[in-house]
UniProtKB/Swiss-Prot annotation:
Family label: Belongs to the IL-10 family.
Species, as recorded: Homo sapiens
Annotated localization: Secreted
A GO biological process held by the record: positive regulation of tyrosine phosphorylation of STAT protein
Record's protein name: Interleukin-20
Disulfide cysteine pairs (residue numbers): C33-C126, C80-C132, C81-C134
Name of the gene encoding the protein in the UniProt record: IL20
Known function: Pro-inflammatory and angiogenic cytokine mainly secreted by monocytes and skin keratinocytes that plays crucial roles in immune responses, regulation of inflammatory responses, hemopoiesis, as well as epidermal cell and keratinocyte differentiation. Enhances tissue remodeling and wound-healing activities and restores the homeostasis of epithelial layers during infection and inflammatory responses to maintain tissue integrity. Affects multiple actin-mediated functions in activated neutrophils leading to inhibition of phagocytosis, granule exocytosis, and migration.
């Protein structure tokens, strides 16, 4: 009798956790790879530094992340790979190289980087389980984005990419 009530309690707790809405938790459907992340927390962290970052951007007529050309038209099967490469770009070249004397901004960027590392870890698991295939379309789109990034001076590219983080976050929110 005790075993059945314990099993029922555990089952009830599991259902409660699965069906209770989590604040800010978003399921990203990236082809065969499905992960959950707190995009609202990332967006809130970025919104606190967005104005100061974008104020440093002197290249207002150039875009690195183009909604139609590079992100929005990405087929579901290629989203995982494209996101994996974009996270690597932000982790290896943007967050690490952003220069500012403002310690508050640097702490926020560190927090954003930690959030991206968590997502990247989940994407690595998908890649290990062969559910994050890198097709020609994903590689072509990433090459276009990287080309736009590399056309700018290194620090200008870092500022531009960080200032466009909201475009990437919007795309991630819209993956369904």
């Amino acid at each position: 009798m005790k075993a059945s009530s314990l099993a029922f309690s555990l089952l009830s707790a599991a259902f409660y956790l699965l069906w209770t809405p989590s604040t800010g938790l978003k399921t990203l459907n990236l082809g065969s790879c499905v992960i959950a992340t707190n995009l609202q927390e990332i967006r809130n962290g970025f919104s606190e530094i967005r104005g100061s970052v974008q104020a440093k951007d002197g290249n207002i007529d150039i875009r690195i992340l183009r909604r139609t050309e590079s992100l929005q038209d990405t087929k579901p099967a290629n989203r995982c790979c494209l996101l994996r490469h974009l996270l690597r770009l932000y982790l290896d070249r943007v967050f690490k190289n952003y220069q500012t004397p403002d310690h508050y901004t640097l702490r926020k960027i560190s927090s954003l980087a930690n959030s991206f590392l968590t997502i990247k870890k989940d994407l690595r698991l998908c890649h290990a389980h062969m559910t994050c295939h890198c097709g020609e379309e994903a590689m072509k789109k990433y090459s276009q984005i990287l080309s736009h990034f590399e056309k700018l001076e290194p620090q200008a590219a870092v500022v531009k990419a960080l200032g466009e983080l909201d475009i990437l976050l919007q795309w991630m929110e819209e993956t369904e």
